[in-house]
Amino acid sequence: IQDHILFAREGCYVSGSRGIITEMLTRKVLSGEITSLTPLMRGVRNSNNAIRIPLMAFLYRTLGPTRFVKGCNMAFWRNDLIRVNGYDESFCGWGREDSELAIRLDNSGVRQRCMKFRGVVFHLHHGKCERNSLSANEERYQQTIREHRTRCEIGLTRHLGETDQTRTPEPEVKIPVPASAGH
């Protein structure tokens, strides 16, 4: 959470990567047997995505944004998410919904801040989602790119009251950023 706060900037969303943990390690975490994870533990996959190296994060961030976003490690400003109407709920099953949201954010002027090597999260093991709709999801994603879409039709506004959709932004809150934040 601290890394997300350090990377938070108005007009930007933050995306990071994740380590993946096995079914056995997930059971131990959920039972409380293990309360802290490290990249080199047995049962951690994608360990290169679970390493926290602040200097590398700074260097990687300067290389520019990536389209490979992971919804399990993203953060947005509320008003930016409302502007693009949140996740497109017409996506079915697994695949491309996170990337499609990132495209709409980018198209609407909200820039990505890559947080690789910071903001480490671990993805708990779960059953595989059906991927029968992957080709339809890919087409929806490509259509958003082609048409330079900034909003989806079926999204967040279905769940918000009218005042939530049109309210003025909250007063600006300044988040103190330590001098050592690496920006």
Which residues are covered by each model-predicted region?
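Conserved donor NDP-sugar-binding/catalytic core segment of glycosyltransferases
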Residues: 1-39
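Active-site donor/metal-binding and catalytic loop motifs
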Residues: 115-132
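Conserved hydrophobic/aromatic beta-strand scaffold that supports enzyme active sites
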Residues: 13, 73-75, 121
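Residues that scaffold the ATP/ADP-binding catalytic core of kinase and kinase-like folds
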Residues: 3, 84, 124
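A short, conserved alpha-helix in the catalytic core of glycosyltransferases
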Residues: 73-85, 91-111, 116-117
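Terminal low-complexity segments of carbohydrate-biosynthetic enzymes
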Residues: 72, 107-111, 133-183
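Short aromatic-enriched loop/helix-cap "lid" or pocket-rim segments at secondary-structure transitions
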Residues: 25-29, 126-127, 133-136
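A recurrent flexible, glycine/aromatic-enriched loop bordering the glycosyltransferase active site
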Residues: 41-75
